[in-house]
Amino acid sequence: MEYIKKIALYMSVLLLIIFIGGCGNMKDEQKKEEQTNKTDSKEEQIKKSFAKTLDMYPIKNLEDLYDKEGYRDGEFKKGDKGMWTIYTDFAKSNKADELSNEGMVLYLDRNTRTAKGHYFVKTFYEKDKFPDRKKYKVEMKNNKIILLDKVEDPKLKKRIENFKFFGQYANLKELKNYNNGDVSINENVPSYDAKFKMSNKDENVKQLRSRYNIPTDKAPVLKMHIDGNLKGSSVGYKKLEIDFSKGEKSDLSVIDSLNFQPAKVDEDER
């Protein structure tokens, strides 16, 4: 009988050790899973925040934005229908110390159903030289860009009048399929960044290569940046960048943004 008791006690202790060890392993696995879920959930939150506007792409007729409302908060005055700001530029380093930046910004006022903005050409220099900046006023009527300023260069004039925003031909409804992004967060601002590797087979990449001079076969990186609350903020902004750059000293990228804010009355604020 005493022998059987010893065997039973031994088995009980052995089972207890196995159980405690198993619980410890389960806790470790749970911690790992929770940590993974935190990273994944933040990545998903960033993508979902962008999807609120990117799901509208492609916006072939920009005047459709007059009938679309974005995120509203306390910054909006009573009766203000808000304003969409759409922006696209192409940045390219021509030399080691020179960067050219060309694109357009358009402000679509939902109150007046009018769209005004400007086309810009900028050149930045690293050395002791001020940047060159030129702006050409434009407006949009019947989904057509109308140049308001006189432009002597016929090639530039054609680029302005035929300009298309990235949001007019891009299709990012499959954004959820971009996975394993590199996510960074600054809770103090707050700001959120996510990077995803793209493929040259991506239709959006093919579109950009057909529209811009991109002298590299390197597959780009999709960079997503948010300033402000992930749920939405009229004082924050979202920016999308498709980066073809080959190295740290090389700049080659397309930047796109579509944001909704209170309508601005003062033209100087733009």
From Swiss-Prot:
Domain of life of the source: Bacteria
Membrane topology annotation: Lipid-anchor
Cellular compartment(s): Cell membrane
Similarity field: Belongs to the staphylococcal tandem lipoprotein family.
Residues lipid-modified (S-diacylglycerol cysteine): C23
Taxonomic lineage of the native organism: Bacteria, Bacillati, Bacillota, Bacilli, Bacillales
GO CC annotation, single: plasma membrane
Residues spanning the signal sequence: 1-22
Lipidation (N-palmitoyl cysteine): C23
Keyword field: Cell membrane, Lipoprotein, Membrane, Palmitate, Signal
Name the record gives this protein: Uncharacterized lipoprotein SAS0403
